[in-house]
Amino acid sequence: MATLACRVQFLDDTDPFNSTNFPEPSRPPLFTFREDLALGTQLAGVHRLLQAPHKLDDCTLQLSHNGAYLDLEATLAEQRDELEGFQDDAGRGKKHSIILRTQLSVRVHACIEKLYNSSGRDLRRALFSLKQIFQDDKDLVHEFVVAEGLTCLIKVGAEADQNYQNYILRALGQIMLYVDGMNGVINRNETIQWLYTLIGSKFRLVVKTALKLLLVFVEYSESNAPLLIQAVTAVDTKRGVKPWSNIMEILEEKDGVDTELLVYAMTLVNKTLSGLPDQDTFYDVVDCLEELGIAAVSQRHLNKKGTDLDLVEQLNIYEVALRHEDGDETTEPPPSGCRDRRRASVCSSGGGEHRGLDRRRSRRHSVQSIKSTLSAPTSPCSQSAPSFKPNQVRDLREKYSNFGNNSYHSSRPSSGSSVPTTPTSSVSPPQEARLERSSPSGLLTSSFRQHQESLAAERERRRQEREERLQRIEREERNKFRYKYLEQLAAEEHEKELRSRSVSRGRADLSLDLTSPAAPACLAPLSHSPSSSDSQEALTVSASSPGTPHHPQASAGDPEPESEAEPEAEAGAGQVADEAGQDIASAHEGAETEVEQALEQEPEERASLSEKERQNEGVNERDNCSASSVSSSSSTLEREEKEDKLSRDRTTGLWPAGVQDAGVNGQCGDILTNKRFMLDMLYAHNRKSPDDEEKGDGEAGRTQQEAEAVASLATRISTLQANSQTQDESVRRVDVGCLDNRGSVKAFAEKFNSGDLGRGSISPDAEPNDKVPETAPVQPKTESDYIWDQLMANPRELRIQDMDFTDLGEEDDIDVLDVDLGHREAPGPPPPPPPTFLGLPPPPPPPLLDSIPPPPVPGNLLVPPPPVFNAPQGLGWSQVPRGQPTFTKKKKTIRLFWNEVRPFDWPCKNNRRCREFLWSKLEPIKVDTSRLEHLFESKSKELSVSKKTAADGKRQEIIVLDSKRSNAINIGLTVLPPPRTIKIAILNFDEYALNKEGIEKILTMIPTDEEKQKIQEAQLANPEIPLGSAEQFLLTLSSISELSARLHLWAFKMDYETTEKEVAEPLLDLKEGIDQLENNKTLGFILSTLLAIGNFLNGTNAKAFELSYLEKVPEVKDTVHKQSLLHHVCTMVVENFPDSSDLYSEIGAITRSAKVDFDQLQDNLCQMERRCKASWDHLKAIAKHEMKPVLKQRMSEFLKDCAERIIILKIVHRRIINRFHSFLLFMGHPPYAIREVNINKFCRIISEFALEYRTTRERVLQQKQKRANHRERNKTRGKMITDSGKFSGSSPAPPSQPQGLSYAEDAAEHENMKAVLKTSSPSVEDATPALGVRTRSRASRGSTSSWTMGTDDSPNVTDDAADEIMDRIVKSATQVPSQRVVPRERKRSRANRKSLRRTLKSGLTPEEARALGLVGTSELQL
């Protein structure tokens, strides 16, 4: 028996965001593993030895020397390859160890759960740590991608502001550095769509990082270029704009000049075009870009002095590729040399928010180049946002100069020239300022360039110092990667945000003059944008006097001063900016930490350093002469005005984290629509109440907590619905008149779900009972309840399998008992009458509606006569008077002891189903009174009605007790598959291997923890002795993770169809039964006949009677022939209405409903809802462990479908019950007694009466047929043959064939048989197979660019390695030209297809113009 004795340790990573990389204990103990036993059976011993804090089901084993995870299902002998090198020394005499830690799937689930349920500081801390988590464990990336982690990142990023998006992009960049992560991004096009959407953000750092990630994506493989085109088309089509609009808005420099973004955007276009295999796709992309005006943009940059060489090179590459594809072979290849550094300046990147003079300039240039009608893309905001006018530009420039902005003032030409009037230079103000600097007026002279170059060395030195400082801060951050430190960091960041908000509000007063005359005087939202906050800070700093010392809080509005000041410093020298990793991760993290510490003024070194950097930034602004702050502010003024107005209109506190990019986030939110419900149910948590949250965050924190109490995960599914819900809350409160919790949305939701919302006022007897639960504290609703309510708001069509409930409309949501009773409450006591003259009694009160006026009060008796019925029956409704008896009897007859119903004049005329009264539509029946008087004459001793009382006998229950659990398990094993088959079946939810009964039996055999421990200890103590069958079975079951959750989920899946059918079919039967009774003529004939008979026998003139009396009709017999009253009713109906039916065959749905307990059905429906919600919890628990993605997706879709179907069932149930109440009103039931009517009993009475009626009717028809046959028999009885036929003297008539009842039946059968023979001939259906479209795909070519990714497997890998990889990728993409100097030869679908630019310039033939629909347009005229 081979063993392995080695050191064991555990790693406390139960919380992935609060974990450490150092295993414990520092002096690890030894554990002896058996190499012939599965590791899963020995895991409990390791767990017990280490006393690890992990849950045993969540544990796994990892080797310390190579980080490989061991398979718990296999033995050590089977995993010898993984143990290679394990016995070697780890250095300094230490041995390697086996580490017990949390399974990858559990950690990933915890990560996603944390991201999905966190907000505020917790979410910031989690996103901040995500990149480091992926760096610490490379295996986590694959699990994260498989578990839909990318979808979670997109969803969180779609709802967050730019700071959170920067954190997410950092983590996404780390994911994409791994092949597993890149493959996950390739397979999930939503990620690329989100990245492309972020290009339209107004925050420069977000745009820059998104562009870098897209560059890495396209550079990775040529096959990724079509995926990018697919994502671009999907996003822009949903926005209603032309594809590649976001890229063009960057190239058109909508929000200022930023050469770095221009280079990235143009490189992305070139890389995408170079990876396209076919010419059609190439021209589709190029034509879109040409329509958007890339030709004019390219010429403007190429003709402009001082344009960055990298940008010039990328523009030339595009032009060469286009000309080559058009067949122009005379073009020269693009220049191969590239500068190592590029110029960059700070601005707000294009978000498509407004279109200024630059856009109009491009349209005019397009008209001149015969491109008028095809290039007019508009973004959704282009029509509403105003554009800059020349006079506004002059006003703004004057205000900037008057306000004391030295950097801008120094950069203005001394000639004081205003906006150029030439068409070629009408650009936005930032571009105008740059053109003025680069114009031949003398600004860009050689001395100015020398001055710029002399400052480049100083900037380079400062940049290197800053990088070293940031790296040091990053190392400190990594060493302090603990929960408390992160919590402190998040708290400091939150305080910084609060102070920045307050400082921004204070600065707004100083910046009033910066806005245009029509703009609102509030620039507070500017402080939430990195670029706009930079610009605002620069304005306010320069506005103050030079001698005024600046408080350290002056830079509080800048969330990331270093990461934004760095490209500012590099603008003039054309230096290479720090790429993805450093720019995204180190600069941002270090800068935020530094700003927080400067705010706290703890280390004086940090404060002085921050002050020095702020001064350096001012120097950079003056040296660069770029006025990036001014350009950023001026170009975003109108957008900020628009957002400020939007934020003032929004009165709810749902967005406490600052101003968000609503347009971009809205687009991001639209990307994920199919998976949101499943994500919510899989990862939803219960939120803490506001009292449990921390209370030290100031007013903004309290506002956020109160908003979170209302807007939980259900409202996060669609943020627009959350806004509308809170805005319409006041409107909804008007409808809820009787609710005490008016200010609580939760209370409103509770009332909505319980059905009390639409009731309004209630009867006086019910008021005290209904007010009690309102005053009780409302139970907090879970996230599942919120998500469930959200799903209820938009249910599917009312169809369950093949059962159609679509005729249940919204009017069935209203219970006539609630509405009508509420509106007609019994009025309070009338006021006392005024004193009358001479003390006479007051006049009687006026009559109620149509009732007969009461008689005058005799004398001084003021007591009115007692009412005929008790008070509850009337409830304030006037009763229709009962007329005088219409029959006069000479003899005393027996009485029918029915309950007379006197119809009320109830105000339910608006309800279609109880608008009329059944009894009012019945026709009066003429009865033979003399015969009835004879038949039902009362004798001296009246017959008492016999009552059948069924004695409820108690059913004896046989209770079988298991004497030994082992015997019970062994008996159960006889009907179950083998244990190994059971385990595989449970893990795979294999319905063929295990049926429903087997699952229920296994549920009774689930081992307890005590049993599991005893079996494992016994096995380890006596390894040679095999376990018994019961013990082995329990041990096999215990090795299945989340066994109980799996079994309950599986049981629900297998039970659901049957349970749903048991609920839906009775509801459909009840609905159909109501329709059958309402439209049944035979029932009307029976009731009218019975009413006429009863009125004669009772000597009354009743209008109706309760249908419960139908139960007694067969028991009442006449006193002469002892025949039942039903027999006489049936006889009259058959005689008076020969076309009536047997009734029973027409109300089959009522008969089926009579067998259903509808109270139990309602309980089953509630139980289905509870089990469905519990199944989500079970699936959540199972998903933590190893579960196939396909299986998880299938189960998630199944549970989502179940939830929707259960909601439909609840709606159907409510509406059918309300319709049944309306039906009872229609049938004449008094309103006060309707709630007491049992549906099962009512249907049973109708069904049993119909069965009795059918039996009686058959007997009556048989007697009638016998009499008819008897009459026919009498026609020939005694006649001789000589009286007729040939024996008679007269000519005989042709013999007529007797055509009795049997003949009619035979003839009908004959016709039916002929019809069957005609229709049963085989029909030939012509089925034309669909023509298959033959498609050809071009073999993918290998990427010519070398893809070398050097990764360090050591655990001490830092951000520098990842950032260096990202830098090398982006640098190679932007600087190194393609090895193919001449673009590739693409396959052509048409030999003569050219680009749109070439086609329009070379002119169109009349035939081509007509084909394109351009006849008569300006293109032909030009």
Curated annotation (Swiss-Prot):
<feature type="coiled-coil region">
    <location>
        <begin position="448"/>
        <end position="480"/>
    </location>
</feature>
<keyword id="KW-0206">Cytoskeleton</keyword>
<feature type="compositionally biased region" description="Basic residues">
    <location>
        <begin position="357"/>
        <end position="366"/>
    </location>
</feature>
<feature type="region of interest" description="Disordered">
    <location>
        <begin position="521"/>
        <end position="666"/>
    </location>
</feature>
<feature type="region of interest" description="Disordered">
    <location>
        <begin position="323"/>
        <end position="464"/>
    </location>
</feature>
<keyword id="KW-0597">Phosphoprotein</keyword>
<dbReference type="InterPro" id="IPR041387">
    <property type="entry name" value="FHOD1_GBD_N"/>
</dbReference>
<feature type="modified residue" description="Phosphothreonine">
    <location>
        <position position="775"/>
    </location>
</feature>
<dbReference type="InterPro" id="IPR014767">
    <property type="entry name" value="DAD_dom"/>
</dbReference>
<feature type="modified residue" description="Phosphoserine">
    <location>
        <position position="763"/>
    </location>
</feature>
<dbReference type="GO" id="GO:0005737">
    <property type="term" value="C:cytoplasm"/>
</dbReference>
<dbReference type="GO" id="GO:0005856">
    <property type="term" value="C:cytoskeleton"/>
</dbReference>
<feature type="compositionally biased region" description="Basic and acidic residues">
    <location>
        <begin position="637"/>
        <end position="651"/>
    </location>
</feature>
<feature type="domain" description="FH2">
    <location>
        <begin position="883"/>
        <end position="1279"/>
    </location>
</feature>
<feature type="compositionally biased region" description="Acidic residues">
    <location>
        <begin position="559"/>
        <end position="569"/>
    </location>
</feature>
<keyword id="KW-0963">Cytoplasm</keyword>
<keyword id="KW-0122">Cardiomyopathy</keyword>
<feature type="domain" description="FH1">
    <location>
        <begin position="827"/>
        <end position="858"/>
    </location>
</feature>
<dbReference type="Pfam" id="PF18382">
    <property type="entry name" value="Formin_GBD_N"/>
</dbReference>
<dbReference type="GO" id="GO:0051015">
    <property type="term" value="F:actin filament binding"/>
</dbReference>
<feature type="compositionally biased region" description="Polar residues">
    <location>
        <begin position="438"/>
        <end position="449"/>
    </location>
</feature>
<protein>
    <recommendedName>
        <fullName>FH1/FH2 domain-containing protein 3</fullName>
    </recommendedName>
</protein>
<dbReference type="InterPro" id="IPR015425">
    <property type="entry name" value="FH2_Formin"/>
</dbReference>
<keyword id="KW-0009">Actin-binding</keyword>
<dbReference type="Pfam" id="PF02181">
    <property type="entry name" value="FH2"/>
</dbReference>
<feature type="compositionally biased region" description="Acidic residues">
    <location>
        <begin position="592"/>
        <end position="603"/>
    </location>
</feature>
<dbReference type="GO" id="GO:0045214">
    <property type="term" value="P:sarcomere organization"/>
</dbReference>
<keyword id="KW-0175">Coiled coil</keyword>
<feature type="compositionally biased region" description="Polar residues">
    <location>
        <begin position="367"/>
        <end position="390"/>
    </location>
</feature>
<dbReference type="InterPro" id="IPR014768">
    <property type="entry name" value="GBD/FH3_dom"/>
</dbReference>
<feature type="compositionally biased region" description="Basic residues">
    <location>
        <begin position="1385"/>
        <end position="1400"/>
    </location>
</feature>
<dbReference type="InterPro" id="IPR016024">
    <property type="entry name" value="ARM-type_fold"/>
</dbReference>
<feature type="region of interest" description="Disordered">
    <location>
        <begin position="1262"/>
        <end position="1305"/>
    </location>
</feature>
<feature type="domain" description="DAD">
    <location>
        <begin position="1359"/>
        <end position="1391"/>
    </location>
</feature>
<feature type="compositionally biased region" description="Basic and acidic residues">
    <location>
        <begin position="450"/>
        <end position="464"/>
    </location>
</feature>
<feature type="region of interest" description="Disordered">
    <location>
        <begin position="821"/>
        <end position="849"/>
    </location>
</feature>
<dbReference type="GO" id="GO:0055003">
    <property type="term" value="P:cardiac myofibril assembly"/>
</dbReference>
<feature type="region of interest" description="Disordered">
    <location>
        <begin position="1374"/>
        <end position="1410"/>
    </location>
</feature>
<dbReference type="GO" id="GO:0030018">
    <property type="term" value="C:Z disc"/>
</dbReference>
<feature type="region of interest" description="Disordered">
    <location>
        <begin position="754"/>
        <end position="781"/>
    </location>
</feature>
<comment type="similarity">
    <text>Belongs to the formin homology family.</text>
</comment>
<dbReference type="InterPro" id="IPR056771">
    <property type="entry name" value="FH3_FHOD1-3-like"/>
</dbReference>
